[in-house]
Structures are given as structure tokens and as C-alpha cells.
Amino acid sequence: KTISPLRHLKQHTSMRALVKSIFNLVILSICFLISSVIQAQQYDLLIVNGHLIDAKNNIDQKMDIAIKEGKIAAVEKKINPDEGKKVIDAEGLIVSPGLIDMHTHNFHGTQQSRYLANSFTALPPDGFTFRSGVTTVVDAGSPGWRNIEIYKNQTIEQSKTRVLTFLNIVGNGMAGGSLEQNLEDMNPEISAAVAKKYADYVVGFKLAHFSGYDWTPTDRVVKAGSLAGLPVMIDFGGSQPELPLEKLLLEKLRPGDIFTHAYAHVNGRTPIVDEDGKVRPYVFEAQKKGIVFDVGHGGGSFVFEQAIPAMGQGFYPNSISTDLHTGSMNGGMKDILNVMSKFINLKMPLKEVMAAATWKPAKYIQRSDLGHLSEGAVADITIVQLQKGNFGFIDTARKKMLGNQKLICELTIRKGDVVYDLNGLASSLWNE
């Protein structure tokens, strides 16, 4: 039985139309599925299964975190992993706001014999921050009003790390020697005006290394703080005879001002723990008044003979910091996580230790936008592991304390980008 050419053509056309319809339907289905997946992946990055410690928001439990466009988009007990373009599994790890190191020295430069002001002893931040979980540093007075513009151009604006600073009351900054003893270069009015001009970066004022038996530098730095509405940080001591520590803490400093190197025992300064191993009563009184006691470990400013009895009597630091520079990084200090680990082993609760390097320093420098992971906050995040084992910790007198816990940085995120990843938590396997 023959089929007419016309009928054959109609059948062929009908078949082609059917195939085309099926093809279009398949394409539409694929597009719909792709669109659904894309819509489902509403977050740039998810961190799941981690134990979040966020002091500002009083969180100390397992939580998932979503990041979008460099900011915290959601913090919930459970977020569907399918909603993230990239997912980091933080099972067994501690997730924290990016650490804030409130005492560093980052005015690295090439001027000789200028100590920490545009010289070799200071360190450029990025090589020493992210690998220890730090996303924000606060330089403790390396620049003064005369060289803050240089510092801004060559350090602040060249760093991925957020760099803030205390402005030295000495116009030439922390240049060492006679330059830091020059009362004529300690101008509170000019310092306050410059701090206001550079308000995006300057968070307070610093006095350090003055060795005269004279309250004038202290009075001038506090005046600068009052004029600008900012705190001051004091590296106190060095005078002969000693200026009384009690007068500094109870009369000279204001609530919110910062006493750094809290656990030091150095010449020219009364230590906070007396000869009988007791914390001096006025030290507790000062902390209750609102004086901020900062660790500022450094290369010569933290000894166990002060820290251990003080911690045993409940005298905890308000902020934990490093005093990072070339003279401290290879000694007992090492990095901020090593310093924090010392306090964990001295029985300071982990939640308090994390707060002392995140939300508390953020408050002290009047930067309430930092140090927490609230929705809408910048996505600066640190993921650490609390290792168990046998460890040794060294002070600046080269004495050792044994411990069984130690913090290690696993991953650091700055403004939503992974900037340090020790074990490839954010990476896929090479053959996948």
C-alpha cells in the first residue's frame, strides 16, 4: 500500500514539530532547574556546624552563618547548605568575629634609629594578622601628628587588614630616645585636631616611654583625649623615683582610658601584684572605676609571677593584645592566639577570652561596628581550633608555664573573602 507524497510530508512535519516541542520542553526544564538552583544559592558563603562565640549578641552555641556581599546576611541554628554558593563545614571548630589586636606596631619603614616610627622594628600588618585570626589592628602610638599622613599612605591604605591607630602625644611618634622625652613636642590641641581630621583611623591617644619624674605628659595626653572625646592608652613607668601608680589609676586616668602592659614587672613602675603575691587593692578599685587593663604582652611586658597570682585572685584583663613588633614576635608572645591560650590555661573562661579580643576592644576604641557578627555587620570572621595536648608557654622573662589547651587559626575571612585557610576548609579537592 503506497502513501502519497503529500501525506508522507505531513507525517514528517508533524514528527519534526513533536521533536521540537519535546526539545523546547527539555530546555525550559533545564533552565528552570538552573534558575531554581541559582535562586536557592542566595548566599556567597555559608559557615555551618561551627560553635559560634559572639559576646555582643551573647551567643555561645552551634550556629550557622551566611555571608552575602561582604556582610553577615543571617545567623541561625540551621541554614540549608544548598543556599550557599560555597559552604565551609566548621564541625568541631570555634567561629568568632575577626580578632581585634588593640596593641600592635605597624609603622614599618626604612628610617634608621626611629624605633617604631617608620622604621624596621615595626611590622607591616598583612603578613602577621590573618594567619593568627586578626582582621583589625590598632597601632599603639607609632605615628604622631607630624607623620600620621605618611602612616596613612604607606600602611593603612596599603593593607588588607583594617588598620586603626592611637595617635602618639609626641608629634614625631614612637621614634625612641630623646624624641619621646621632648615635652615641647607634646601638644594636646594639635593632636586633638589631627585626630578629628583622621577620624576614620585615629581611635585614641598614646603616651609611652617617658622617663621623667613629671606628670606633664600624662596630663597632656589626657587633655588631648578630652578635647577629641577619645580614650588614651598609657605605657606607664620608667621614672626614677617612680611616679605613684595609684595616683595614675585613680586620679589621672578617666573611665575608659587604657592601662597597657598590665602584667609587667619592669623598672620604674610599681607592679600590680605586691611582694606578698596580692593584687594591690587600688588596682581592683581602678578596674571597677572603668580603667581598661590591657595585656600588651610584647617582648618585655608579661611575666607569670604577676599574671598567675593576679588571675588566681580573679583579676582578669579587659583586653588581650600582643604589642606586636620584631622584638616580640619570636619570643614568648608569638601571636595573639598564643597570648589568648595562656589565659585559657590560667582558667579564664573561653567565652571571656574571646570577648577580650573581639567585642570588648571594639567598645574601648568606640567602634561598635566591629567585633560582632550581627546581621548587616561586616563579615570579618575567625575560625579556630582549640587543641588538647601538652604545651609550653613562655613569658618575657623566659620562664615556662605548662598547659593543656592551645588555640590554632584554621581560617580567616575579611569582608567576606577567605584570606587565610590553614587546611583548605574553603577549597574543593583537586580531582573533583
Residue ranges: model-predicted function:
Residues K85, A90-E157:
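Metal-associated gating/positioning segment near the N- to mid-region
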Residues S36-A40:
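Sec/Tat signal peptide C-region and signal peptidase I cleavage site
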Residues I22-S35:
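Bacterial N-terminal signal peptides
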Residues E305-K388:
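His/Asp/Glu-enriched, well-ordered alpha-helical/loop segment
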Residues Q42-L46, L52-G98:
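Histidine-rich, glycine-flanked metal-binding segment
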Residues I150, D185-F293, S301-N318:
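Histidine/acidic residue-rich metal-binding segments in metalloenzymes
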Residues P124-K152, S159-G177, Y198-Y213, G229-M233, ...:
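Divalent metal-dependent hydrolysis catalytic cores, especially in the metallo-beta-lactamase
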Residues G50, V378-W430:
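C-terminal cap of metal-dependent C-N hydrolases
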